[in-house]
């Protein structure tokens, strides 16, 4: 299995695995995910708990012994269910928020840090490749911030909420409004075989 970790952030959070179908773009990974329903209700197996014991004394001084655990939970209400994204749950991603101005400021710093990191790698001394990566990321950011596009996105950090790390984007495509799609800057991910 391949695990993709945050390359730039201090905590190197897990952000993605190859358990998900990854569509490789020029500078991004795009991942279709799904919403799943989680049950908040607790199932109690009174056989494993052994039941509870309670005593009552009636007017005739008769003692009644009760060992039915269900009596103890008679007035407890069901907690219900909730929806969560399967990728968010599996990798403990944390939703955060940006307005256009703060996201643009974040991306300027992130791109700078990412390009500096890439330049420091001995295998990445090709200036044309570095320029291609930088322009590709800038083009992606420009497109996602254009007009009303920005409002379509939700933002997620790794579990440590590292402010220097990669922020994943989630949106719903116009042609597939029921499938949440995540977008990651692929050069900001470190692939690890586990």
From Swiss-Prot:
Any single GO BP term: asexual reproduction
Subcellular location: Cytoplasm
Keywords on record: Calcium, Cytoplasm
Cellular component GO terms, alphabetical: cytoplasm; cytosol
Pfam family, one: TCTP
Domain TCTP: 1-194
PANTHER family: TRANSLATIONALLY CONTROLLED TUMOR PROTEIN-RELATED, TRANSLATIONALLY-CONTROLLED TUMOR PROTEIN
Family listed: Belongs to the TCTP family.
Biological role stated in the UniProt entry: Involved in calcium binding and microtubule stabilization.
Name this protein carries in UniProt: Translationally-controlled tumor protein homolog 2
């Amino acid at each position: 299995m391949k695990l993709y970790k945050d390359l730039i952030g201090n905590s190197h959070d897990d952000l993605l695995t190859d358990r998900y179908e990854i569509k490789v773009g020029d500078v991004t990974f795009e991942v279709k995910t799904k919403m799943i329903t989680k049950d908040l209700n607790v199932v109690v197996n009174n056989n494993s708990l052994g039941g509870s014991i309670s005593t009552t004394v009636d007017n005739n001084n008769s003692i009644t012994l009760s060992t039915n655990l269900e009596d103890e939970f008679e007035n407890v209400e069901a907690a219900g269910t909730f929806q969560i994204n399967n990728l968010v749950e599996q990798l403990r991603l944390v939703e955060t928020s940006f307005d256009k101005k703060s996201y643009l400021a974040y991306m300027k710093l992130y791109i700078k840090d990412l390009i500096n990191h890439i330049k420091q790698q001995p295998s990445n001394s090709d200036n044309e490749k570095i320029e291609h990566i930088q322009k590709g990321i800038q083009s992606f950011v420009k497109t996602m911030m254009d007009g009303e596009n920005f409002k379509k996105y939700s933002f997620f950090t790794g579990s440590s909420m590292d402010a220097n790390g990669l922020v994943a984007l989630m949106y719903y495509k116009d042609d597939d409004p029921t499938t949440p799609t995540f977008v990651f800057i692929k050069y900001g991910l470190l692939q690890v075989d586990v």
